[in-house]
Amino acid sequence: MTTDILRVNTIYIISKGRPRCRTAQTLERIRYPGEWHIVCGNNDETLPQYQERWGERVLVFDWHDEITRTDTMDNLGFEKYPSGACPVRNATRRISDERGEARHWQFDDDYLGFTIWSRELGKNVVISDGAILYEAMLKIAEFGYRARMQNVGFVLDTMESHPEQRYTFSPRVFNAHNLPSTPDLFVPWVGRMNDDIINAINIWRRGGYEMSVKYLHIEFAKTQSEPGGMTDLYRNDGTARKTAYGILAAPSAVKLVFRFERYHHATAWGKLRPKLLDEKWSRESGPPPAPPKQTHSLAKSALADKWRKALL
């Protein structure tokens, strides 16, 4: 297929401090036939362990150069605080573009498996054959290419993966991202924390579109249970600060809530999505007519005069 030639289905696993890389292990276990790599920064102290274990699959970017153009949405610097995932996400986009790809996948490094809705069995089933995952992801990537989607993906194995929701979609991509590799369509990632929500906010309010399908799912390790990555930052600063970055990005649409036994964010996507308006509101049609001037009855005027004289 044309999109297959353009290369839209390569997986890049973004990882730091986790050289065993559960996602890579999972892809090997199911014998995934497609191309995949692990992307690490040159600031990672465990980089030699990655290279020893995964060899040429490890791609290294210059983290020190990347942070000079990273917008963390704060002034905390990089000496005491981790940079977050934005440097590696933006660097991965450039790596993919330089390799001649039209689109690419960005995965986290803690995936334990994948499930998919089976029409024959009428339920979600575990994917044990990597070829099934490859074909399912290729269909999503090809759709993203044809529709010029700025982000498209699939959901985590949570309540969103319930079989009843298999034909619905989510208005944002939480984890498995299929992104454009060319700078004309790619929306740069910003924010030290909560970068996935902020990226969705920036896509939607610029008139773009992103979505997650719910018939393909990721089985993942318990949140903040894996060492490395962003776990230490979340444990030290809490998820309330994570929500704060979302509020900074869209204060009218994001708020702090308490759910899943922790502080979390809630986003009113309806306040961010572009809306189709009636032609009568078009600027070419001019502004709506001014309302008629209010007229006062004689009785009200007489009463006003009475009070005015009394005050004088």
Which residues does each predicted region cover?
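Short, solvent-exposed loop/turn segments at secondary-structure junctions
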Residues: 18, 44, 66, 110-112, ...
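A short acidic (Asp/Glu
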Residues: 22-25, 48-51, 115-119, 162-167, ...
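Active-site-proximal specificity loops/subdomain of glycosyltransferases
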Residues: 42-107, 112-125
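Conserved catalytic core of nucleotide-sugar-dependent glycosyltransferases
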Residues: 112-197, 201, 311
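Hydrophobic beta-strand segments of well-ordered beta-sheets in folded domains
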Residues: 8-12, 33-39, 57-59, 148-152, ...
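C-terminal catalytic/acceptor-binding lobe
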Residues: 6-9, 18-22, 191-193, 197-312
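A structural signal for short, well-ordered beta-strand segments and their strand-loop junctions
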Residues: 103-108, 150-155, 210-214, 255-258
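Short, well-formed alpha-helical segments that are part of the catalytic scaffolds
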Residues: 10-36, 44-51
